[in-house]
């Protein structure tokens, strides 16, 4: 069974538009979790393909300083994974949601219960950056009969054989990491990045999205030329926190309506 997220993003790719997925931190809002759907609606109205929702955690190994601070603000409001899932169960969204979390919160929640409860939301994808592919059986047996795709991350340092292993049988999309290190770094791209992304996109049979360090309209243009779209996190999180909703809407509209 082809999962909803795969079909949804593939349809956008087939329409010759760039896929655009913004990242937000759940609970990082003046209203806490009560403002979550306000932010989601703002992004939906700007035409996004899907929305990545971050789960705050005390040791976010893949997060750069902007997203880490957002997580700390959310944790200070006593936002938990349980509370986030309950909030997401209240209302269906127009576009698929993708949860980005770490192993420990899922383990503490209970893996089977986590997948079961997510199935009652609009979440169609799951990213766990500290879950090695060798240990994916931690959760894949529970996802197999669900409509939730486990999204693999592929970095520049990933060897060809390893890339093929990650890509084969992957669902949802391939998360291509544009820089070595944490989210939010900009301008530190390797010279062979475009070639790496082009090769990855040519080999994969599901959409390839470029993330980590993507923050400008020029980045959107560049990475849409060598992959199927982009994920933007730190810029969105920072601008939302600074109250720049109009600026966010304009930027997201540009990325969401980019024609190939």
Curated annotation (Swiss-Prot):
<comment type="function">
    <text>The alpha subunit is responsible for the aldol cleavage of indoleglycerol phosphate to indole and glyceraldehyde 3-phosphate.</text>
</comment>
<dbReference type="GO" id="GO:0004834">
    <property type="term" value="F:tryptophan synthase activity"/>
</dbReference>
<comment type="subunit">
    <text>Tetramer of two alpha and two beta chains.</text>
</comment>
<dbReference type="GO" id="GO:0005829">
    <property type="term" value="C:cytosol"/>
</dbReference>
<keyword id="KW-0456">Lyase</keyword>
<keyword id="KW-0057">Aromatic amino acid biosynthesis</keyword>
<feature type="active site" description="Proton acceptor">
    <location>
        <position position="63"/>
    </location>
</feature>
<feature type="active site" description="Proton acceptor">
    <location>
        <position position="52"/>
    </location>
</feature>
<comment type="pathway">
    <text>Amino-acid biosynthesis; L-tryptophan biosynthesis; L-tryptophan from chorismate: step 5/5.</text>
</comment>
<protein>
    <recommendedName>
        <fullName>Tryptophan synthase alpha chain</fullName>
        <ecNumber>4.2.1.20</ecNumber>
    </recommendedName>
</protein>
<dbReference type="InterPro" id="IPR002028">
    <property type="entry name" value="Trp_synthase_suA"/>
</dbReference>
<dbReference type="Pfam" id="PF00290">
    <property type="entry name" value="Trp_syntA"/>
</dbReference>
<comment type="similarity">
    <text>Belongs to the TrpA family.</text>
</comment>
<keyword id="KW-0822">Tryptophan biosynthesis</keyword>
<dbReference type="InterPro" id="IPR013785">
    <property type="entry name" value="Aldolase_TIM"/>
</dbReference>
<dbReference type="InterPro" id="IPR018204">
    <property type="entry name" value="Trp_synthase_alpha_AS"/>
</dbReference>
<dbReference type="InterPro" id="IPR011060">
    <property type="entry name" value="RibuloseP-bd_barrel"/>
</dbReference>
<keyword id="KW-0028">Amino-acid biosynthesis</keyword>
